[in-house]
Amino acid sequence: MDSLWRETVKLPRFEPLEGDFTTDVLVIGGGLAGLLCADQLTRAGVDCALVEAERLCGGATQNTTAKITVQHGLIYDKLIREFGADKARLYLEANQRALDQYRKLCQGLDCDLEEKDAFVYSRTSRKKIDRELAALERLGAGAEFADNLPLPFQVAGAVKFGRQAQFHPLKFAAAIAGRLNI
């Protein structure tokens, strides 16, 4: 299956590296993680270069769901049970900071950033949803129950997080790449 994102944007192409060069930091890999690392280093004034063997965002990034959210599956109940509420809260807070940082990074970029609600559902177990919602309430997260989703099948319930986001990851990557030494 072809990437929806790759079909709707043309990423910049770069000539193969010829000869030696000097840099303080070399970032290897031109996926979203590599681009963001190189961007943050460059913004901090670090002499940085990024190298990619194939093409920018040719791996996982081109097939992403493109959602930017603090909810990645039914994870918080499990985190509390396995690691405790303090560590689960740290995970939640780190994801919230990442969401906020993406919003800042997207300002002024043509990347189709939209505020969206995020849902994680269970087709069969309302109990799983209730446990997740109880865990999120314990952590102070603003999630709520939903069961009327625009899906072609019934669900037992869903965790709904408001004010999450979605964007065009390759438009974002192209904008970031344009200001880097690649």
What are these regions (language model features)?
Residues M1-V25, R43:
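Extreme N-terminal leader/targeting segments of oxidoreductases
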Residues L133-E137, A158-I182:
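Helical element adjacent to the flavin cofactor pocket in flavoenzyme catalytic cores
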Residues A66-V70, G162:
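Short, hinge-like loop/turn segments at secondary-structure boundaries
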Residues A60-Q62:
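Conserved catalytic-core motifs of eukaryotic protein kinase domains, centered on the activation segment
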Residues Q71-D147:
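Dinucleotide-binding Rossmann-like beta1-alpha1 core, especially the glycine-rich loop
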Residues F21-L50:
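N-terminal Rossmann-like FAD-binding beta1-loop-alpha1 element of flavoenzymes
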